[in-house]
Amino acid sequence: KENTGFCGAVNEGIRRADTPYVILLNNDTEVLPEFVEELLAAIKKSDRIFSAGAMMIDYHDRGRIDNAGDYYTAFGWAVARGKGKPLAEFNRPCRVFSCCGGAVIYRTGLLREMGPFDERHFAYLEDVDMGYRAKIHGYINCYAPGARVYHVGSATTGTRYNEKKVFLAARNSMYLIYKNMPFLQLLI
């Protein structure tokens, strides 16, 4: 069977889902109590909320953030919010550009309305693309710090930085810009 990457795998799960919400959770995470309840509470706060992302804590340094949502720069770079910073600095819920696909809840109906994860991404930045599309459609992505997971990071690919991961991240960054950014911003 062909390896369809992260996107192909989650799209298959979403296609089979018969629930109002779907939760994506990486295989290198350890979930803390109240994870599901906190994500559900966050996404149910408004019908305009498309996704709610968990506080992802560095598995090896449990006092530090691995990801607290993503932000996107004017130059087209996605950045993991809070990476390496103390947990205490990220205890407040807030809007984010996108939620990390490693520990997130989505509204199934809106996922279907906006279309599946773009399988041309294969892996990496597909969650930023999904967050971008949600914003284009007028929806909100939020950070739910009460939902917590410990995240090893790159357990599937072996290392944080390897040739394939760097290639996919660079390629997907360019594709993300081309696909979603307004034409006038591309000229900057």
Predicted regions and their residues:
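Hydrophobic/aromatic residue at the end of a short beta strand that borders the catalytic acidic motif
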Residues: 6, 25, 30-35, 106, ...
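Short aromatic/hydrophobic "clamp" motif used to bind/position activated sugar donors
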Residues: 22
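Conserved donor NDP-sugar-binding/catalytic core segment of glycosyltransferases
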Residues: 29-73
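Short, flexible, basic/aromatic active-site loop/helix in glycosyltransferases
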Residues: 73-97, 112, 174
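A short, conserved alpha-helix in the catalytic core of glycosyltransferases
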Residues: 97-148
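Active-site-adjacent helix/loop segment of glycosyltransferases
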Residues: 140-188
